[in-house]
Amino acid sequence: GWRDWLNKGKEWLKKKGPGMVKAALAAATQ
């Protein structure tokens, strides 16, 4: 279900991309 997908996404972000998260947030706020 979508919860499983969301959890996988969270784990991926923890491993791959604090910087990517920051960049996405910066882009979203512009």
Swiss-Prot record:
<dbReference type="InterPro" id="IPR010002">
    <property type="entry name" value="Poneritoxin"/>
</dbReference>
<keyword id="KW-0929">Antimicrobial</keyword>
<dbReference type="Pfam" id="PF07442">
    <property type="entry name" value="Ponericin"/>
</dbReference>
<dbReference type="GO" id="GO:0090729">
    <property type="term" value="F:toxin activity"/>
</dbReference>
<comment type="similarity">
    <text>Belongs to the ponericin-G family.</text>
</comment>
<protein>
    <recommendedName>
        <fullName>U1-poneritoxin-Ni3a</fullName>
    </recommendedName>
</protein>
<keyword id="KW-0044">Antibiotic</keyword>
<dbReference type="GO" id="GO:0005576">
    <property type="term" value="C:extracellular region"/>
</dbReference>
<dbReference type="GO" id="GO:0050832">
    <property type="term" value="P:defense response to fungus"/>
</dbReference>
<dbReference type="GO" id="GO:0031640">
    <property type="term" value="P:killing of cells of another organism"/>
</dbReference>
<keyword id="KW-0800">Toxin</keyword>
<keyword id="KW-0295">Fungicide</keyword>
<comment type="function">
    <text>Shows a broad spectrum of activity against both Gram-positive and Gram-negative bacteria. Also has antimicrobial activity against S.cerevisiae. Has insecticidal and non-hemolytic activity.</text>
</comment>
<dbReference type="GO" id="GO:0042742">
    <property type="term" value="P:defense response to bacterium"/>
</dbReference>
<keyword id="KW-0964">Secreted</keyword>
